[in-house]
Amino acid sequence: MITEEKTINEATIQESNTEERGQDYLVAELEHHNDNTLDYKEDSIVEEVSTNEEEGVLRRRDVPPETLLEERSGSPRHEGHQAPPEMDPLARPSEFERDLFGSDPSYPDDVYDVAEQIKIYGGKTPFDEPRPILEWGYPLYSEGALGRTYTTFGEKNLLRPQLLVFGDFRSAVAFNDNGAQEIGQLAARLNLNVDLKLTSTERIHMFLRPIDKNNNFLRHEFFGNDHGEFDFVFDGNIEALFFEGDVGAIQSGLTDKWSTYDLPIAFGFMPLLFQNGLWVEDAFVGGAFTIPAKNSPKFDISNMDVTFFAGIDKVTSAAIKNADGQIEDSKSNVFGVTAFIETREGYFEGGYGFIDDKRDGDQLSDFDYHNLTASWTKRYGGKLSNSVRGFWSLGQTPNGSNTQTADGFAILVENSLVTHKPLTLIPYANFFIGVDRPQPLVRGNDGLLKNTGIAFETDGLTGFPKLDSSAQDAYGFAIGIENLFDLSRQVVFEFATVQPFGGQSETIAGDQYALSARYQHNLNDRWILRTDAILGILGNADNLSGIRLELRRKF
């Protein structure tokens, strides 16, 4: 009786409360019983539902339109109603194409291991990575919250200074026969970078090579004309010193207002590299700025950068030499513009440059010339990666009876096959043809074929022999295969040739052939072992050969 009386009283009270609030509020209760019991109560204004007193059922007054999106909550009011999403007037719905969708991948032979999947994110452990020899301010690759910052350049471009000194030390032993002479030597080279980071976008960088100068390295010859001699070389000159930053970020700091643009800049004694170093690879005194990250739906351009640059000193071009045939790096200026464009599932690079010969006189002057370049890189059918590069030097009219040093064009075609191991096993076949005297814009004595094959590049340390890389009045190719294994080793085998037009040109005495090989192995995270070998057969000239062993220490 007590229970029954209590139940009746509670029901009476609840019915009374419902009548009092019936004009304004409704209480809906949902009890759902399964493994977990869910009790749901919702107080809401009665505007969208009606009550059938006879059945005691809540019903909608109006059925919602079909375009209305619902997120059902268990309540008859469905408060999750949303309006249809708005579409930009420039956008259009696309047609559904069933062929573009496939079933999920199936791996019947692989058992899904939850623990192994978690390790991808949570199983990381620290390792003893190489450290710079000097870290001041805060360490490189540090974790956790950012450290102390300063408002020296403004609250929106915070100063957080960091000084790093890093680089590598190279030492090699080599037996080189360049045809004219045979040398056995032990040589060394030190690359030293000093980087002062100011803000997240601004820094000052300096590069030094203290133990080599003018291609003379710290070395000891144990075979050759200077047998038994030790050459100690010290060079206190700076190889590069420049400022790099972003005008937009600097403006934000100075005005305390966020800028709406990016404008990267650099100036000083600065290095530049374009077209993988084939067109420009040098450090000169000058400046550059870039208009970055542009796009054009109309022309199917997903990303585009345009860079303008100029140099007024230390400009090295093989077209500007003195009477002894040495490059005059202080006698010319360079001005240019280059663009990088991602479009139509490919990559385009194009550029224009002008070398201004500053020399006046009756002997050597007026060696100015224009330089154009363009390239297109794309993968075809998932089987072939291809790059086509063009270089054109024109407009040079030297004074008197001096011979042109930059006038002609070259076309390079680089191909590699996409194998079942596309990142590590790479067969390649690169071809070239050059007419007259094509020249890079700025890159010293190296020719346009530096990256065509390993037979066309030296080592920058021992004077390792190579085939002629000028591509002047010649054609040829380099065919080889590269294997990177598990990315800890590299093996390359290559056959290359240079064929001058008519069997002989002004710069190439005859046909050239070479077999080359390279082995490289990272012994650990600091030491790298590398060996190179070449055997060259030269028409109308002495043959060449070389073998070398190098150890490189990173720090």
Give the residues covered by each predicted segment.
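Outer-membrane beta-barrel "beta-signal"
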Residues: 542-555
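Signature for the C-terminal beta-barrel architecture of outer-membrane proteins
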Residues: 264, 270-449
